[in-house]
Each structure stands twice: as C-alpha cells, then as structure tokens.
From Swiss-Prot:
It comes from the Bacteria. One of its GO terms (molecular function) is pyrophosphatase activity. CDD domains: NUDIX_Ap4A_hydrolase_plant_like. InterPro entries: Nudix_hydrolase, NUDIX_hydrolase-like_dom_sf, NUDIX_hydrolase_CS, NUDIX_hydrolase_dom, RppH. The keyword Hydrolase applies. Its EC number is 3.6.1.-. This is RNA pyrophosphohydrolase. Belongs to the Nudix hydrolase family. RppH subfamily. Accelerates the degradation of transcripts by removing pyrophosphate from the 5'-end of triphosphorylated RNA, leading to a more labile monophosphorylated state that can stimulate subsequent ribonuclease cleavage. PANTHER family: ADP-RIBOSE PYROPHOSPHATASE (PTHR43736), DIHYDRONEOPTERIN TRIPHOSPHATE DIPHOSPHATASE (PTHR43736:SF1). SUPFAM superfamilies: Nudix.
Length: 174
C-alpha cells in the first residue's frame, strides 16, 4: 500500500538495553545491518504494526519491552531506483516511517530471530546508540540520524551525536 506520493507506510524500531545500546540486526544472507522495520497493513495502527514487526523480526512480545517514545511525524527516505522492484518502478519512491524507541525489559535470551518461517535477520548484536548512523546503507542514514536525534531526549545518559563523533574519531586516531 503506497500513499499518494509513492511512499509505503512503515514503522522503525530502535530497541535499547539497560546500557543504552541499540539492537542491530544482520539481514539474512547479506552483509548489511539495520534496525527492525516493516510495513503498516491497511487498518493497522503504527503501534500495532510495531508490535507485530517486533514479534516477526526479533521474536519479542509486548511484555518484553517498554515504549519510551515515538517520532512525532513521518520520516521519509527514498529508495534508489536500482533497489526498487521492477513492477513498482514509477510509482514507488520509498518509505515513510514512524519510529518507536523501546527498552528491553526482558532478557537478551528472549530474542528469537526464528520466530517466523521467513526470518529477516540471521544475526544480531548490541551497538553504541549512534553507531548505526554511519553503518547503515547510505540512503537510510539521514532517517536514522533524525530518528535517533529526536528520540534521544527519552534516554538518560546518551551523549549527543556530535560528542559521539568527536569521541570515536579521537579513539580511531590513537
């Protein structure tokens, strides 16, 4: 389902742990990593879609997480034409997303990447809060930075993106 501008309604999930690290999933049979995300079905609320995607992609139930916040508005990214299915070219531009910030209140062992017959991820790890901005595929970077920046206000002890960049560039120079 596309909106009139050619964007597919979607939810993005930033799952955090008690150390303010974020869940980072490795796509099945690929070398790319990303946050869990997925489409919103007709008649489904963004929150309901988030819980469905969380179960499908990460194997977590609502009792395993606490919602800390969500983005106020849709965040959009365009998908390069060579990434778009041939039958969608001309009508599909990209994704528009509502992002949710969650805290894992369960255990790491509650994560189950094989909760469905069609897993999205075949590996996962915890990452520094800002690390995904530089690690995700280029066309998603702006949305990742905007989502993490907007939702950082719900986190205690998370440094600014600028401070993170300064710290990590200093560490890499040593």
């Amino acid at each position: 389902m596309l909106d009139r501008d050619g964007y597919r309604p979607n939810v993005g999930i930033i799952l955090t742990n008690a150390k303010n690290e974020v869940f980072w999933g490795k796509r099945v049979r690929e070398h790319s990593w990303q946050f869990p995300q997925g489409g919103i079905k007709p008649g489904e609320s963004p929150e309901a879609a988030m819980y469905r995607e969380l179960l499908e992609e990460v194997g977590l139930l609502p009792q395993h997480v606490k919602i800390l916040g969500r983005t106020r508005d849709w965040l959009r990214y365009e998908v390069p034409t060579n990434w778009v299915r041939r039958e969608w070219r001309g009508s599909y531009k990209g994704q528009k997303q509502i992002w949710f910030l969650l805290r894992l209140v369960g255990r790491d062992s509650d994560v189950c990447l094989r909760a469905t017959n069609h897993p999205e991820f075949d590996g996962w790890r915890w990452n520094d809060y800002w690390a995904p901005v530089d690690a995700v595929i280029e066309f998603k970077r702006d949305v990742y930075e905007r989502a993490l920046s907007e939702l950082a206000r719900f986190m205690r002890g998370v440094e600014s993106h600028h401070a993170y960049l300064a710290r990590t560039s200093t560490q890499s120079e040593q």
